[in-house]
Amino acid sequence: VAFAPPRELENPFIETTREGFHTALDISAYSLVAMAKRAQPLMQAHGGSILTLTYMASERVMPKYNVMAVAKAALECSVRYLAFEMGEHNIRVNAISAGPLNTLAARGVSGFTSFREQMGSAAPLRRNIDQSEVGDTALFLCSHLARAITGEIMFVDAGYNIMGA
């Protein structure tokens, strides 16, 4: 779950309102903590996996992502704290940081298509990803094969995140 009021993404970051900042963090970061709190009693007998989605703008500036980048950074930190605290119940918490996906919503973002093309050509695998690759990663992280993975941010972006600026 992620959201920031559109004006907070359109205006310069320094113009972020207190209300917009709060909304973005509440919906995009705190929602994971609230969900994990409610899921823990249901999961602690048999363990399990909690996943969330993030974006590399949590680590580097992506123009017009603004307060959502701050929220994603908070989300990633929450993943680590939840992984630490829930680990004793064999509950793993991880995040998938996906590259730009060609969705209807994404295509509505100004400049998305050219940005996606640039990322695909700059990625080590020289391509973009698709939804099935994110789904496959989620399936892996929820499976027994990932039983020793927790507190991690798993990049699914054809390697783009390893590239310099």
Residue ranges of model-derived segments:
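Conserved SDR Rossmann-fold cofactor-binding beta-strand/turn motif
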Residues: 92-102, 142-145, 155-157
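Short C-terminal tail/terminal secondary-structure segment
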Residues: 138-139, 150-165
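Catalytic loop of short-chain dehydrogenase/reductase
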Residues: 3-37, 44-88, 100-102, 160
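Short, small/polar-rich loop/turn modules that mediate ligand/substrate recognition or access, typified
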Residues: 87, 92, 149-151
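A conserved structural motif in NAD(P)-dependent oxidoreductases
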Residues: 123-134, 145
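A glycine/serine/threonine-rich, flexible loop-to-helix segment
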Residues: 88, 98-123, 133, 163-165
